[in-house]
Amino acid sequence: MISVDGLTVEFGGTTLFSDISFQINEKDRIALMGKNGAGKSTLLKILAGVRQPTRGKVTAPKDCVVAYLPQHLMTEDGRTVFEEASQAFAHLREMEAEIERMNGELATRTDYESDSYMELIEKVAAMSEKFYAIDMTHFEEDVEKALLGLGFQREDFDRPTSDFSGGWRMRIELAKLLLQNPDVLLLDEPTNHLDIESIQWLEDFLISSAKAVVVISHDRKFVDNITTRTIEVTMGRIYDYKVNYSQYLVLRKERREQQMKQYEEQQKMIQETKDFIERFKGTYSKTLQVQSRVKMLEKLELIEVDEEDTSALRLKFPPSPRSGSYPVIMEGVGKSYGDHVVFRNANLTIERGDKVAFVGKNGEGKSTLVKCIMNEIDHEGTLTLGHNVQIGYFAQNQASLLDENLTVFQTIDDVAKGEIRNKIRDLLGAFMFGGPEESMKKVKVLSGGERTRLAMIKLLLEPVNLLILDEPTNHLDMKTKDILKQALLDFDGTLIVVSHDRDFLDGLVTKVYEFGNQRVKEHLCGIYEFLETKKMESLRELERKGGKA
């Protein structure tokens, strides 16, 4: 369906990838994998036609519809949420208008035998066949389903898009793309602004309804669930695996071991050849052999080994000062903004050493309750922090508190103590600040995502006994998430984490607080047991509704 031939991208004297080729077929479910900076997003932009390669080409049939969701979106205001999502069908209205226009032209023309008249008839017939094959009778229902599935409430439908944050606007754009039912769907980090329920809905939709999908995502569970093919971008090349992400990791390890074996054998041969040349270069009887070996080395294609992931670092928190037995106790806590009730009558007891998750749809009060704990906003009820509680707090706006005049290295060097001081560069590399140039950048030139990662590292090095993390994984790759998760498992204090990343929460938390319908409900289980319970509750709810009907 889409053919990529000899694609090369160069800029600033650097080759991002060279002479890569692959095919995207109908119903393919492809995950693009590789380190940050390997060129995944660039490749997606080229497939979408919004960027041109240095060399090579991307070809597709004329009627192939490609839809692209970038990481960062420029949105326009002026419509309601429902109207904007309905723009997914604008091309069909344009098609209908074009059919009417061409039929009108046919009605007025009299050159029935001309080639152009016959061509117009054929064009009308082809477009009409395509148009009437599409069921337009349920489009409003489809828009409603997509918006509800992605977390909107019915009362949101008539609100202007300008009322919503960038994350919610991204959901509107995602709904539009899904409703278009394109031949190829290109998604760059689609789960970044979604909650767990919306991610699950998106998974179900992509599996059951989408055609070909190419996705970049750091959400391991999402990628595993929806993809059956993995294309890795590494060192300017691609490797194509006909398996999902988890199986790809196994095959990649085997391939790298094979590469390393071949590399070592080649290096041994090269050294032996160089030794021969050095030993006999002045010996007349060996002149031809020496010259032959010199030419062989000049023509030899060196075996390269894929980049080793150097971020296999074990991060350890400083020892936690001992807190009281109950770091957080809430009785009847609630929060309202005017007539809008976020949640009411929340009763929580978090014990020392607990690792708990706050989950639920966006806007149900997870971050609001965190702000109550941090005493950033007032609230109803009683909220008590235990004896000697020392809080480490990470939120998306923590990055704005960094000293902009310090370098990345200085920012961490100022807080690092003990043996970790000898591993600052390893630590920075693990959080995607690899190399001297990256570590010597001033904070003021960093992107938002880079600042967020730096704020995270800084927090992890401070001695605290209650760690509160609000969406800590949004700007982390899979390896960095693994390092953070292991560090949190080893953390001997108390943890509250707000996250939509199921794989990250799995095995980390043993208690889940669910936010929804103005309530906070406690579940004494891990994330997957909680999700299974929710699934059963949803099925029972459907059965009850079915019984009433």
Language-model regions, residue ranges each:
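Hydrophobic stripe of amphipathic alpha-helices that form coiled-coil interfaces
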Residues: 102, 109, 134, 141, ...
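ABC ATP-binding cassette signature C-motif
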Residues: 1-261, 312, 316-549
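Short, flexible active-site-proximal loops enriched in glycine and acidic residues
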Residues: 155, 268, 305-308
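ABC ATPase nucleotide-binding domains
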Residues: 259-281, 286-295, 311, 532-549
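ABC transporter TMD-NBD coupling linker
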Residues: 293-311, 355
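Short amphipathic coiled-coil heptad-repeat segments
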Residues: 144-150, 275-279, 295-300
